[in-house]
Amino acid sequence: MPKMKTNSGSKKRFTLTGTGKIKRKHAFHSHILTKKSKKRKRNLCYSTTVDTTNVSQVKELLAMK
């Protein structure tokens, strides 16, 4: 059976940390920023980890299963 291909869109969006968690960026921080508050924009600029409910799906896209 051939190897599973990595989803090319996913490999641009997700990175694996040293502890095995999957890191992602927040959405809604690219345009139409004038109506968003300073606090909201600041919180959106930081990266976060993928939720535990979605980890298996993201790992499948990254061909890690």
Curated annotation (Swiss-Prot):
Region Disordered, annotated ranges: 1-20
Pfam families: Ribosomal_L35p
GO terms for MF: structural constituent of ribosome
InterPro entries associated with the record: Ribosomal_bL35, Ribosomal_bL35-like, Ribosomal_bL35_CS, Ribosomal_bL35_sf
Superkingdom of origin organism: Bacteria
One Gene Ontology CC term in the entry: cytosolic large ribosomal subunit
Keywords of the record: Ribonucleoprotein, Ribosomal protein
Claim: Zinc is one of the keywords in the record: no
The keyword Ribosomal protein belongs to this UniProt entry's keyword annotation: yes
Biological process annotations from GO: translation
Similarity comment: Belongs to the bacterial ribosomal protein bL35 family.
PANTHER family per UniProt: 54S RIBOSOMAL PROTEIN BL35M (PTHR33343), LARGE RIBOSOMAL SUBUNIT PROTEIN BL35M (PTHR33343:SF1)
Name listed for the protein in its UniProt record: Large ribosomal subunit protein bL35
The species this protein was found in: Bacteroides thetaiotaomicron (strain ATCC 29148 / DSM 2079 / JCM 5827 / CCUG 10774 / NCTC 10582 / VPI-5482 / E50)
Organism lineage string: Bacteria, Pseudomonadati, Bacteroidota, Bacteroidia, Bacteroidales
